[in-house]
């Protein structure tokens, strides 16, 4: 949100600013309040439960924010996996920096999305959600490496 052009795009898209609780407790608390309002209004809320961009291309442990959100607002959670991001401008492949070479894979590089069935909030843990997202990633990986049998 601090970068002028990206910040404007984030605000236009309705993104919610988030900061680690230790870094900025006020922004941290406001993020959960804003998330609750989005859900109370009947809108969709997309989050990145890892809490940051991967530095090695692998799915990182999911943090507790998702648990806090569904504890306050018990809505179904739709597991979504973003595919083929590693090596794109959205990864930290260039010495830990994101957006280092935006056109590395060309002007029209492809990324994908895989979606699983909604999971009920009751009893859902960050670990269970992470397992489902990892399953989506594994299926995608297998589909790219296996050859169809005639």
Predicted segments with their positions:
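A conditional alpha-helix N-cap/helix-loop micro-motif detector
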Residues: 24-29, 59, 126
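Hydrophobic/aromatic ligand-binding patch that stacks against planar heteroaromatic rings
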Residues: 9, 37, 68-72
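TIR-domain catalytic/interaction hotspot
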Residues: 28-37
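Catalytic-site beta-strand/loop segments enriched in glycine and acidic/polar residues
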Residues: 36-67
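Catalytic core of membrane glycerolipid acyltransferases/transacylases, capturing the structured
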Residues: 1-25
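A cross-family acyltransferase "interaction/gating" segment
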Residues: 55-124
């Amino acid at each position: 949100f601090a970068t002028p052009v990206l910040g404007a795009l984030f605000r236009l898209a309705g993104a919610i600013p988030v900061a680690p609780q230790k870094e900025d407790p006020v922004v941290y608390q406001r993020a959960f309040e804003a998330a609750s309002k989005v859900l109370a209004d009947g809108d969709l809320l997309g989050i990145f439960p890892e809490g940051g961009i991967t530095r090695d291309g692998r799915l990182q442990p999911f943090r507790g924010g998702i648990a806090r959100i569904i504890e306050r607002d018990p809505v179904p959670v739709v597991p979504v996996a973003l595919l083929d991001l590693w090596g794109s401008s959205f990864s930290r492949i260039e010495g830990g920096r994101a957006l280092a070479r935006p056109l590395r894979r060309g002007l029209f590089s492809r990324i994908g999305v895989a979606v699983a069935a909604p999971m009920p909030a009751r009893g859902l843990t960050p670990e269970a959600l992470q397992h489902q997202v990892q399953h989506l990633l594994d299926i995608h990986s297998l589909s790219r490496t296996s050859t169809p049998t005639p």
